[in-house]
């Protein structure tokens, strides 16, 4: 079974979506690192971890409540999903596939479900989500990317048009091509 997140009394209180299909591109830095690839703690929105399919909830509802765990566990939270399917294979460390079935634990919602798949070909990644459902109040979203923006003048490119407006929000219909401030295309 999948452990949905490791949350302790003094650590990771907002990490409940880490196992909802997170995938962060690490391609920059010398050596390549999370920091060099756009991750910074300051400004990070834990509701939008790259790759995750998650509920649209206010930040106040994100903090884990670990007071009601069983007496044997102590002050920690390691909730198990009732889904047991997750796995992947690779070919020569270059091409591969990973898939998982997501079911959020009943403590937080219990009705959020999805099937997620990633296909890795050369320098391309194809991410697919299907059978996404949620019976609880509020919407569901899948986050493509979240990067630290060191300079607001670094453009996001949407369908070939540079966007320097910050913050920026748009709803795109049909096919779209996005390029983040680190030159990763989606």
Regions found by a protein language model. Give the residues of each.
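Catalytic and substrate-binding regions of extracellular carbohydrate-active enzymes
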Residues: 1-175, 179-185
């Amino acid at each position: 079974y999948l452990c949905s997140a490791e949350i302790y009394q003094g650590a990771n209180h907002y990490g409940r979506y880490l196992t909802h299909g997170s995938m962060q591109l690490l391609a920059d830095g010398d050596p390549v690192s999370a920091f060099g690839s756009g991750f910074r703690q300051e400004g990070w929105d834990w509701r939008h971890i790259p790759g995750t399919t998650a509920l649209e909830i206010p930040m106040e509802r994100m903090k884990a409540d670990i007071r009601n765990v069983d007496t044997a566990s102590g002050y920690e939270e390691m909730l198990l999903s009732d889904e047991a399917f997750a796995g992947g294979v690779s070919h020569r460390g270059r091409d591969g596939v990973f898939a998982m079935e997501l079911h959020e634990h009943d403590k937080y919602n219990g009705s959020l479900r999805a099937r997620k798949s990633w296909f890795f070909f050369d320098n391309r990644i194809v991410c697919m989500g299907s059978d996404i459902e949620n019976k609880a109040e509020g919407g569901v979203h899948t986050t493509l990317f979240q990067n630290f923006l060191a300079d607001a003048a670094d453009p996001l490119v949407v369908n070939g048009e540079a966007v320097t407006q910050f913050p920026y929000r748009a709803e795109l219909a049909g096919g779209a091509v996005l390029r983040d401030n680190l030159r990763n295309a989606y």
